[in-house]
C-alpha cells in the first residue's frame, strides 16, 4: 500500500511539473509573437499579383522595385498595428475607400496604355525610371490598403487584445517582427522556385522570346489582365466597407410617402375641377383615344431608359446598402417594419456597495465570456480592499438608523397630539372647455399615490356626450346630400365622429423607430390588385409555376363570362336611377393621368401549382443589396449541401458507431436465459425493418440529388426532355413492335400458333402520358408549359412486357400497373429511381424444358449384381449361429466362456472374408462396365454423326413444305373469299379440324393393375361406365352391348333411367310396363322441343344440317329397330309446326358413331327427340303447352338471372371460359337449365385491328335480382314507363345511372342505310367489306366465332328499351300529353284505313307531304325549346354560369386535414388529367370503374337544386366544416346519337324478348306439371294467310297490342278480320296466338317497321316492302 501511495505522489508531481512547463511555453510572449508574425506574412493579399507579374518579366530592376515596395508596405502595415497614428490613418474605412477608388482608376487606365519606349523617343530613359517608381508605389500602396482576398479584421483585433494583456510588449514586438521577416523570405523563395523552373527550360524560354516578347500586343494583353483582376479583387474586398457618402436619416419621412401624398392631392384637385357635362367628356375621351398610341410609346421608351439607369446605379453605386437591414422583420402589412435598434453594450450585473446591481458596463461578448469563466473561479476567495470599505459603511448606516428609531420612541410620550396633513403631489388633467380648470386623476391610476401603472386612461369625448342626448335623424337625408354634391371632400364631413377618433388616436400614439421604406416579397408583388411595384425587395425561395387549368382553352367559359358581364351591365342600368352620376365618376377616373387603373390589363385567370426545389436555399428571406455576414468557418465539400456548418461543429453530426456499448449490454441481458430467444429474434426482425427503412431513405435521397442535379443547369433539362421524347417514340413505334414480330416468327418456325393479335392488343393498351417534373399527369398529347426549361416526366400506363406465351393471369390493378420512363429507355417505379427488373423472356422456357427432361426415365446402366458366393456365406452364417445357440445349454460355465470366445473369432474371420470378396467383385464389375459404357458412347457418336447430315436435310425440307403449304392455302382462301365461296370454306375447314382432333381413349382405369379402381368396382356408377363405353366408339362393337343388355338377368341390375336412354338409341326393347314411366319423361322432351325452335341454332349449322339429310337417312335405317306402325300412329295423332320436319326425318334415330362430325353431334339429339315424340302412343295434341296469362300491357319479360342496368347482360351460370374447348360435344339443355341464350350474328360486330374491343367487358357476370319477377310494361305508355323506372331506381340506389333523353333529330333522318345488319340480309345496302379476312388470318378469332355460334351467350338487356328521363312532369303537362296522344291515334288510324284502299303512288305522295309538315313542326318545337333555355339563362346569369361550368368539370376545394392524405391527392391528379383531355367521358368512365375517383366524397346537393339562396344559407366556411371536400358535381350523361336511338327502337322487337315467357313456377322448380288435354287442333295463321298479309299481321300485332277487341269500323283489313275469326275459335288463348306467331318472324318484318316508323318511302331494294302507311308509335 505504501508503495502504491509513493507511485501516485511521483506521478502527480511529474504531471504538475510537465503541465507547468507546457503552460509557460504556450503562454510565453516569444511563441505568441512568432505565431502572429507568421500569420501577417502568410496572409493572402492582392499585392502578390503585382509581385508575380514582376517576377515573370526578366527585368531585374522591376523585380527589385516590386520586392522592396511589398516589404516596405507590409512593414508599414505591421507597424500600424502597434502605433496609434498609423492605425487611425490606415484603419479608417472612409479614408481607405477614398484612396483606393482613386488609385485603382488611375492604375486601370495606366495599364491599358501602350508603354513601348520607341514611341516616347528621347524621353525613353526617364519614362523607364518612372515605370520603376510606379511598380514600387503599386506594391507599397496595395500593402498599406490591406485589400485581402479573404478580407477579415480578426488578425488586427487579436493582436490588440494580446498587446493589452502581455507585460513584455517589446519582446512580443521583436518576436513578431522576426517571424514576419522569415515568412516574407519564405514566400519570395517559393515564388522564385515556381517561376524559375519554367524559365530554366530552354524550349519554353525560346518560344516566349521568339513569339511573345517581340510582339507588342502581348504586353498590352498582360497588363489588361493584371489590371482587371486587381480591380475585381479590390472591389470584392471593398464590398464590406461603407461608402463615404452621408445617407438619409432613418427618423425622417420617406420619399415614397411624400410622393404618394402629393399624387393624392393632385388627383383630388383635378377631380374637383372637372365638369360633369356629357358632351365635354365625350370630346375629351376622343382626344385621349387618338393620342393614346403615341403617348404610350413615348412613356414606354422613358420607362426603359429609367430601368437601365437604375440597374447600372444599383450595381455600382447603391447609397442605401448600409441603411438596409440584414433580415426584415414584419410587424404589420400596412406599415413599415419596426427597427430593433440595439447598441453594442447592454446592462449587466455588477457589485456596488457590496450588492449586485444593474449597471451599463461592457459588450455582450465579454459578458458571455465572464459567464463561461465564472464556474472555474467559485472555489477561490479573492480579498479586495473595496469590499472592506463597503462593509464598514453599511455597519455605520445600521447603527445610525437604530439610534434614530430609539430616540423617536422615547419622545412619543412627551409630544402633544396635533393633527396635521402631509401635502402630496398629484397628477391633474385639463378640461377642453376651460383650460384653467383641472381635474385630479383617480387614485387608482395616479402613479404618485398608488405606484406605477401601465394602464391607459380613456377620455370621454364631448362628441359622444352630445350624441347621447340628440335624437336620431333620417339616414336617407345624409345619403341624398352626398349624392347631390358628388364631391370627395364632403364624404369626410358626413362622419365627424370618425375624424375625431383618428385625431384622438394620434395623440396617444407613440413614435417608434421604423425603416424608411416598406419591403415586399415576390408573392406580395404578384398579389397586388392595382399598380404592382416593378420589383420585389426580399428574396423568396426558388419556385417554378405550372399551369393546371387555362380558361382560354375552354371557349364555353369565356362566352358565359361575357354574357354574364353584359347582363350585369344591363341590370345596373335598370336599377340605378342616377346614371349620370355613375357615368361621370367612371369617365373622370378614365381621363385622370395619375391613375394607372384605367389601363385594362389582360386578366390572368389561369390556376397554377408551384414547385419548389430541394436545394439548400441560403438566401431565403434576405434583402436585396444588403450586407452579407461573412461565414469564414463554413467549408462546402459537396455540390449541394442541405445543412452548412463549420468544421468546429462536426462532432454534433449524426454518427454511426459500429460497436455501441449499450447494444452489447442488451444482448447480454437477452442471452442470460434460454427463454430470451424469442426476444432475440424480435430484435433481429426489428433490425431488418430498420435496414429496409434506411434503404428507402437512401433511395429517396439519391432521387432528390439526381433531380436537383438535372435542375441545377439550364441546358440539362432541354437535353433530358428531348431524350425522353425520343425514347418514348422509339419504344412505342420501333422497339416493341419489332420484338413482337421476332417472337411470333420464332413461334411459327417452331410449329406453334402465332400470337399477333394478343401482343398487339397489349401494346395498344400501353399509353404514354406526359407529366410535370414532380409527376402530375397531364393530357395524352398535351405537354406542360415550358417543358424544355422546367423539365418533364413521361408516365407509362399498363406497360407492355414481352412473354414467350400468353397466360391467362389476372392483370395488375390500375393503381400499380404504371411506371416512369428514363433517359436510357428503361422503366422505373419512382421518378429518378433505379430501373426495375423485368421478367426474363427465356426463364419460363428453360423451366419448362427442365420439367420435361425430369419426366424422362434415365436408364440405369450400373446395377449391383450379387454373386452366388455371398449368398452361400450368409446361409452358412445363419446355420452356425442356430447350432451354437442349441448346444449352449449342454456345457458348463467354463466351456461357455470358451465357446463365446471361439464364436467371436469365427464371426470376425467370416466378416473379413466377406469384405474381401465384395471388394474383388466390385472392382471387376467397375472395370468391365466402364469399358463397355465408353465403347457404347463412342459407337453412338460415330453413328449419329453420319446420320446428322441426313437429319438436317429432312428438317429443312419439312419446313420448306410446311411454308409452301401455308402460303398456298392462304392464297387459295383469299381467292375463294373474294369469289364468295363461303359455305365450301366452312365445310373444308371443319373437316380438316376433325381429322386433326382424333383422340383414342382406352380403358386405362380397368387395364392398369396398379390403379385403385381395380379393387373396388362398387365405387363406379353405371352412368360413368356407359359413358366411357360410349366414348370408345371404334374399338367397341354395339352388337355385343345390345346382346348383353337384352338378357333378362343382367338387365335387372341396370337402372331404369339408363334403360330408357338406351331404349331411345334402340339398344333395348322396351316392355309394356316401362312405357308409362317413359311417357312422363317424353312430355318434358316434347315441351322443350315446342318451346325451343330453330332460332336457337346458328344459320351455319342449319345450312350444313340440310345438306346432309340423305347421308343421315341411310345411316339411320341400318340401326332402326322400331316398328313403322308406332311411328305412323304417332304422326296421325297430332299436328304442330314441326310436323314437316318430323315426316321428312322418320328414320333418323341414331347417327353414325364412327364419324366424329361436330355438326352431326350437335343435331343428332334434336332428331332423336323429335322422333321420340312420335314414338309415343298417347293421344295428346302436339301443340300442347303451358298457358300464360298475358295482359294488354305485357310485352317484354325480365329474366331472373339478368342484370337490368347493363347494355349487354349475361346469365350467372354461363361463362366464356366454360365454352372454350367444348365445341365438339354439345348436349341438349334441359328445362332445369337457363334458357336465356340467343343467337347473335358476328357480322353485326365489325372487328378491326385499329379498335380492339374486349367483348367480356360488355357482359356483367353477376346478377342482382334475388327473386324472379316479371316486369312487363307497354311501350306506348310513357307515364307508366316513368313509374316503372322510378321503382327500379329506388331499389338499386345506384349513383351513376345513365340519363338518356330523346333526340328530336332522329325523325328527320332520311338515311338509306340502317345501323344493324341482322343476319346479313341488307348486305347490299351497307356494302360490307369481307369480314372473314381477319378471321382466316388470325385463327384465334375462328375458335371464338365457332363457340359463340354454337352457344351464344349475349343478350340485350332491358336498358335498351327504357327511356330514361328523370324529369318531373307537372300535372298539367301530363294531361296535355295524354290528350294529344289520343287525338293523334284516332286521326292516324283513319288515315291508315284510307291509305290501304288507295294505290301505291298516292301513298307515297301522302307520306311526303306528312314528312314535310312534321319537319316544320319539329323545327318550330326545337326553336321554342332553345328560346326557353335562353330565357332561363338571361333571368339568372350567375346560376347559368355555375351550371354550365359544373356540367363541364368537377371542381372541389380542399381543407388541409390529417385524414385527407392519399386518396385526396389521387383524386386531384385524376381531375387535373381530366381537365386536360379532349375526350373526357371515356377517361372518366374508366377511372370510375377502376375505383380511382372516390365519388362518395361528393355532397348530396344537386345542381338543379343549387340556387343563390341555398348558397347564402349554407355559407362557404360552415359547409367546409361539415364536409372535408366541397364537390359540386354533374351526373354523368350519355352522348345521344341517331344510331343509338335507332338501335334502341329496333331492339324492342328482337326475337328473344317476347318469345317464350313461361310460368314462374316452372322456371323456379325446374319441373313441368301435366295439364288436361284440350282436343282442339292448333291452327297456324301463317299457313292460311298470304305472304303479304302475313307480314302486315305481324307488324300490326306488334304495334297495336294495347287494344284487345276489334271494332267494326276498324276491321276493314284482313288481318283484323282474321283476328276476329281466331277469337271465335279460340277465345281463351288470344294472347298465346300472338305469342306463338312472333318467334317464327325474321328481321324482314323489322325492316318493314323501320320504313313505316321513320317515313322512308324508298322500298325498291326489298321485294316485300309494299305495305301501306300505318299508325306511328305513340311515344315518338
From Swiss-Prot:
Bias type Polar residues, positions: 562-586, 1123-1138
Coiled coil: 1384-1436
Membrane topology per record: Multi-pass membrane protein
A Pfam match: Ycf1
One BP term from GO: protein transport
Main localization category: plastid
Record's protein name: Protein TIC 214
Source organism: Cuscuta obtusiflora
The gene coding this protein: TIC214
Amino acid at each position: 500500500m505504501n508503495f502504491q501511495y509513493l507511485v501516485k505522489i511521483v506521478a502527480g508531481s511529474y504531471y504538475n511539473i510537465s503541465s507547468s512547463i507546457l503552460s509557460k511555453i504556450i503562454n510565453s510572449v516569444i511563441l505568441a509573437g512568432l505565431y502572429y508574425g507568421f500569420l501577417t506574412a502568410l496572409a493572402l493579399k492582392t499585392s502578390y499579383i503585382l509581385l508575380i507579374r514582376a517576377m515573370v518579366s526578366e527585368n531585374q530592376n522591376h523585380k527589385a522595385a516590386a520586392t522592396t515596395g511589398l516589404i516596405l508596405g507590409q512593414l508599414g502595415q505591421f507597424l500600424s498595428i502597434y502605433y496609434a497614428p498609423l492605425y487611425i490613418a490606415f484603419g479608417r474605412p472612409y479614408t481607405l475607400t477614398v484612396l483606393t477608388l482613386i488609385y485603382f482608376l488611375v492604375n486601370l487606365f495606366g495599364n491599358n496604355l501602350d508603354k513601348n519606349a520607341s514611341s516616347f523617343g528621347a524621353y525613353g530613359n526617364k519614362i523607364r525610371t518612372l515605370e520603376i517608381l510606379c511598380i514600387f508605389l503599386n506594391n507599397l500602396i496595395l500593402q498599406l490598403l490591406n485589400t485581402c482576398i479573404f478580407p477579415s479584421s480578426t488578425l488586427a483585433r487579436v493582436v490588440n487584445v494580446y498587446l493589452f494583456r502581455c507585460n513584455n510588449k517589446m519582446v512580443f514586438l521583436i518576436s513578431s517582427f522576426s517571424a514576419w521577416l522569415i515568412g516574407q523570405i519564405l514566400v519570395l523563395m517559393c515564388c522564385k522556385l515556381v517561376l524559375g523552373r519554367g524559365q530554366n527550360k530552354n524550349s519554353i524560354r525560346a518560344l516566349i522570346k521568339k513569339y511573345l516578347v517581340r510582339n507588342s500586343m502581348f504586353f498590352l494583353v498582360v497588363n489588361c489582365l493584371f489590371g482587371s483582376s486587381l480591380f475585381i479583387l479590390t472591389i470584392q474586398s471593398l464590398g464590406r466597407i461603407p461608402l463615404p457618402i452621408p445617407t438619409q436619416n432613418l427618423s425622417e419621412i420617406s420619399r415614397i410617402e411624400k410622393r404618394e401624398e402629393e399624387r393624392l392631392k393632385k388627383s383630388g384637385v383635378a377631380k374637383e375641377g372637372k365638369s360633369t357635362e356629357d358632351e365635354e367628356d365625350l370630346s375629351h375621351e376622343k382626344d385621349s383615344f387618338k393620342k393614346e398610341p403615341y403617348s404610350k410609346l413615348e412613356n414606354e421608351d422613358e420607362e426603359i431608359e429609367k430601368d437601365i439607369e437604375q440597374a447600372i446605379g444599383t450595381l455600382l453605386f447603391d447609397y442605401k446598402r448600409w441603411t438596409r437591414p440584414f433580415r426584415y422583420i414584419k410587424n404589420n402589412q400596412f406599415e413599415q417594419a419596426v427597427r430593433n435598434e440595439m447598441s453594442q453594450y447592454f446592462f449587466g450585473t455588477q457589485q456596488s456597495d457590496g450588492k449586485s446591481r444593474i449597471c451599463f458596463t461592457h459588450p455582450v461578448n465579454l459578458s458571455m465570456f465572464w459567464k463561461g469563466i465564472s464556474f472555474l473561479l467559485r472555489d477561490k476567495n479573492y480579498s479586495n480592499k473595496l469590499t472592506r470599505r463597503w462593509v464598514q459603511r453599511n455597519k455605520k448606516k445600521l447603527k445610525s438608523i437604530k439610534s434614530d428609531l430609539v430616540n423617536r420612541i422615547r419622545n412619543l410620550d412627551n409630544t402633544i397630539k396635533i393633527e396635521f396633513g402631509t401635502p402630496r403631489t398629484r397628477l391633474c388633467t385639463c378640461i377642453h372647455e376651460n383650460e384653467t380648470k383641472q381635474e385630479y386623476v383617480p387614485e387608482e391610476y395616479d402613479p404618485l399615490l398608488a405606484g406605477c401603472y401601465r394602464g391607459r386612461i380613456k377620455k370621454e369625448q364631448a362628441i359622444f356626450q352630445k350624441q347621447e342626448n340628440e335624437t336620431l335623424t333620417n339616414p336617407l337625408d345624409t345619403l341624398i346630400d352626398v349624392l347631390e354634391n358628388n364631391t370627395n371632400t364632403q364624404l369626410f364631413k358626413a362622419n365627424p365622429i370618425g375624424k375625431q377618433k383618428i385625431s384622438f388616436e394620434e395623440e396617444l400614439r407613440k413614435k417608434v423607430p421604423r425603416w424608411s421604406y416598406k419591403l415586399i416579397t415576390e408573392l406580395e408583388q404578384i398579389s397586388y390588385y392595382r399598380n404592382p411595384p416593378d420589383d420585389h425587395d426580399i428574396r423568396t425561395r426558388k419556385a417554378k409555376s405550372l399551369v393546371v387549368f387555362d380558361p382560354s382553352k375552354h371557349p364555353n367559359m369565356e362566352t358565359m363570362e361575357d354574357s354574364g358581364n353584359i347582363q350585369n351591365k344591363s341590370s345596373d342600368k335598370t336599377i340605378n336611377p342616377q346614371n349620370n352620376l355613375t357615368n361621370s365618376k367612371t369617365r373622370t377616373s378614365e381621363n385622370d393621368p395619375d391613375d394607372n387603373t384605367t389601363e385594362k390589363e389582360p386578366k390572368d385567370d389561369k390556376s397554377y401549382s408551384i414547385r419548389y426545389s430541394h436545394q439548400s436555399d441560403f438566401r431565403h428571406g434576405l434583402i436585396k443589396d444588403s450586407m452579407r455576414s461573412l461565414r469564414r468557418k463554413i467549408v462546402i465539400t459537396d455540390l449541394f449541401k442541405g445543412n452548412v456548418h463549420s468544421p468546429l461543429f462536426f462532432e454534433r453530426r449524426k454518427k454511426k458507431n459500429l460497436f455501441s456499448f449499450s447494444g452489447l449490454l442488451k444482448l447480454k441481458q437477452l442471452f442470460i436465459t434460454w427463454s430470451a430467444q424469442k426476444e432475440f429474434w424480435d430484435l433481429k426482425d426489428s433490425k431488418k425493418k430498420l435496414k429496409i427503412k434506411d434503404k428507402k431513405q437512401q433511395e429517396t435521397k439519391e432521387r432528390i440529388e439526381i433531380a436537383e442535379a438535372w435542375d441545377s443547369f439550364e441546358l440539362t433539362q432541354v437535353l433530358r426532355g428531348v431524350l425522353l421524347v425520343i425514347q418514348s417514340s422509339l419504344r412505342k413505334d420501333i422497339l416493341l413492335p419489332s420484338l413482337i414480330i421476332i417472337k411470333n416468327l420464332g413461334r411459327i418456325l417452331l410449329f406453334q400458333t402465332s400470337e399477333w393479335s394478343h401482343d398487339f392488343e397489349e401494346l395498344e393498351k400501353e399509353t404514354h402520358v406526359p407529366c410535370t417534373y414532380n409527376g402530375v399527369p397531364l393530357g395524352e398529347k398535351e405537354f406542360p408549359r415550358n417543358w424544355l426549361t422546367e423539365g418533364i416526366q413521361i408516365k407509362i400506363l399498363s406497360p407492355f412486357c414481352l412473354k414467350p406465351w400468353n397466360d391467362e393471369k389476372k392483370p395488375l390493378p390500375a393503381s400499380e400497373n404504371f411506371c416512369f420512363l428514363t433517359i436510357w429507355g428503361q422503366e422505373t417505379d419512382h421518378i429518378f429511381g433505379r430501373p426495375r427488373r423485368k421478367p426474363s423472356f427465356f426463364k419460363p422456357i428453360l423451366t419448362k424444358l427442365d420439367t420435361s427432361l425430369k419426366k424422362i426415365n434415365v436408364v440405369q446402366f450400373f446395377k449391383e449384381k450379387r454373386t452366388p458366393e455371398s449368398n452361400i456365406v450368409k446361409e452358412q452364417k445363419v446355420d452356425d449361429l442356430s447350432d451354437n445357440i442349441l448346444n449352449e445349454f449342454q456345457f458348463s460355465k467354463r466351456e461357455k466362456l470358451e465357446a463365446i470366445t471361439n464364436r467371436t473369432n469365427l464371426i470376425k474371420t467370416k466378416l473379413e472374408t466377406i469384405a474381401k470378396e465384395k471388394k474383388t467383385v466390385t472392382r471387376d464389375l467397375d472395370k468391365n462396365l466402364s469399358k463397355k459404357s465408353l465403347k457404347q458412347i463412342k459407337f453412338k457418336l460415330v453413328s449419329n454423326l453420319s446420320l446428322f447430315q441426313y437429319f438436317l436435310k429432312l428438317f429443312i425440307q419439312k419446313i420448306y413444305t410446311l411454308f409452301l403449304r401455308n402460303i398456298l392455302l392462304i392464297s387459295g382462301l383469299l381467292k375463294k373469299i373474294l369469289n364468295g365461296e363461303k359455305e365450301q370454306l366452312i365445310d373444308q375447314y371443319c373437316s380438316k379440324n376433325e381429322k386433326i382432333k382424333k383422340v383414342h381413349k382406352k380403358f386405362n382405369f380397368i387395364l392398369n393393375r396398379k390403379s385403385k379402381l381395380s379393387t373396388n368396382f362398387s365405387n363406379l356408377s353405371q352412368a360413368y361406365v356407359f359413358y366411357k363405353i360410349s366414348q370408345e366408339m371404334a374399338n367397341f362393337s354395339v352388337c355385343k352391348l345390345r346382346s348383353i343388355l337384352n338378357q333378362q338377368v343382367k338387365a335387372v341390375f341396370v337402372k331404369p333411367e339408363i334403360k330408357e336412354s338406351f331404349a331411345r338409341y334402340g339398344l333395348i326393347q322396351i316392355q309394356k310396363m316401362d312405357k308409362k314411366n317413359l311417357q312422363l319423361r317424353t312430355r318434358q322432351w316434347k315441351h322443350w322441343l315446342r318451346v325451343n325452335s330453330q332460332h336457337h341454332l346458328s344459320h351455319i349449322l342449319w345450312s350444313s344440317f340440310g345438306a346432309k339429310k340423305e347421308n343421315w337417312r341411310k345411316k339411320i335405317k341400318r340401326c332402326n329397330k322400331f316398328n313403322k306402325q308406332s311411328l305412323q300412329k304417332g304422326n296421325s295423332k297430332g299436328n304442330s309446326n314441326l310436323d314437316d320436319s318430323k315426316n321428312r326425318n322418320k328414320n333418323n334415330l341414331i347417327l353414325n358413331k364412327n364419324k366424329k362430325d361436330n355438326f352431326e353431334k350437335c343435331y343428332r339429339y334434336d332428331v332423336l327427340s323429335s322422333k321420340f315424340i312420335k314414338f309415343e302412343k298417347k293421344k295428346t295434341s302436339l301443340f300442347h303447352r303451358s298457358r300464360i296469362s298475358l295482359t294488354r300491357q305485357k310485352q317484354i319479360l325480365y329474366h331472373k338471372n339478368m342484370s337490368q342496368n347493363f347494355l349487354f347482360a349475361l346469365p350467372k351460370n354461363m361463362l366464356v371460359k366454360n365454352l372454350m374447348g367444348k365445341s365438339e360435344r354439345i348436349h341438349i339443355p334441359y328445362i332445369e337449365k337457363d334458357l336465356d341464350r340467343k343467337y347473335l350474328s358476328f357480322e353485326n360486330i365489325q372487328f378491326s385491328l385499329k379498335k380492339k374491343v374486349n367483348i367480356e367487358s360488355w357482359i356483367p357476370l353477376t346478377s342482382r335480382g334475388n327473386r324472379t319477377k316479371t316486369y312487363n310494361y307497354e311501350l306506348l305508355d310513357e307515364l307508366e314507363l316513368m313509374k316503372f323506372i322510378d321503382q327500379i331506381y329506388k331499389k338499386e340506389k345506384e349513383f351513376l345511372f345513365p340519363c338518356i333523353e330523346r333526340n328530336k333529330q332522329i325523325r328527320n333522318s332520311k338515311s338509306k342505310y340502317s345501323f344493324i345488319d341482322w343476319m346479313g340480309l341488307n348486305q347490299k345496302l351497307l356494302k360490307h367489306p369481307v369480314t372473314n379476312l381477319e378471321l382466316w388470318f388470325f385463327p384465334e378469332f375462328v375458335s371464338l366465332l365457332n363457340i359463340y355460334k354454337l352457344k351464344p351467350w349475349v343478350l340485350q338487356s332491358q336498358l335498351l328499351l327504357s327511356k330514361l328521363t328523370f324529369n318531373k312532369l307537372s300535372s298539367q303537362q301530363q294531361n296535355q300529353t295524354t290528350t294529344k296522344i289520343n287525338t293523334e291515334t284516332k286521326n292516324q288510324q283513319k288515315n291508315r284505313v284510307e291509305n290501304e284502299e288507295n294505290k301505291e303512288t298516292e301513298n307515297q305522295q301522302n307520306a311526303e307531304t306528312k314528312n314535310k309538315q312534321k319537319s316544320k313542326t319539329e323545327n318550330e318545337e326545337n326553336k321554342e325549346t332553345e328560346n326557353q333555355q335562353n330565357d332561363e339563362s338571361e333571368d339568372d346569369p350567375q346560376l347559368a354560369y355555375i351550371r354550365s361550368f359544373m356540367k363541364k368539370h368537377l371542381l372541389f376545394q380542399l381543407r388541409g386535414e390529417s385524414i385527407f392524405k392519399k386518396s385526396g391527392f389521387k383524386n386531384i391528379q385524376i381531375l387535373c388529367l381530366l381537365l386536360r383531355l379532349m375526350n373526357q367521358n371515356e377517361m372518366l368512365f374508366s377511372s370510375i370503374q377502376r375505383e380511382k375517383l372516390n365519388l362518395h366524397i361528393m355532397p348530396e346537393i344537386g345542381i338543379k337544386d343549387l340556387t343563390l339562396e341555398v348558397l347564402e344559407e349554407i355559407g362557404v366556411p360552415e359547409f367546409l366544416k361539415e364536409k372535408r371536400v366541397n364537390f359540386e358535381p354533374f351526373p354523368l350523361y350519355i352522348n345521344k346519337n341517331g344510331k343509338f336511338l335507332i338501335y334502341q327502337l329496333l331492339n324492342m322487337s328482337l326475337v328473344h324478348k317476347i318469345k317464350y315467357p313461361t310460368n314462374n313456377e316452372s322456371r323456379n322448380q325446374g319441373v313441368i306439371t301435366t295439364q288436361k288435354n284440350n282436343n282442339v287442333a292448333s291452327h297456324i295463321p301463317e299457313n292460311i294467310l298470304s305472304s303479304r298479309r302475313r307480314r302486315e299481321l305481324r307488324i300490326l300485332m306488334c304495334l297495336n297490342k294495347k287494344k284487345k277487341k276489334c271494332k267494326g269500323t276498324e276491321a276493314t283489313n284482313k288481318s283484323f278480320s282474321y283476328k276476329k275469326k281466331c277469337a271465335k275459335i279460340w277465345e281463351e288463348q288470344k294472347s298465346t296466338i300472338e305469342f306463338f306467331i312472333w318467334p317464327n318472324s325474321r328481321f324482314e318484318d323489322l325492316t318493314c317497321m323501320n320504313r313505316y316508323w321513320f317515313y322512308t318511302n324508298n322500298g325498291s331494294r326489298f321485294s316485300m316492302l309494299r305495305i301501306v302507311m300505318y299508325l306511328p308509335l305513340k311515344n315518338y
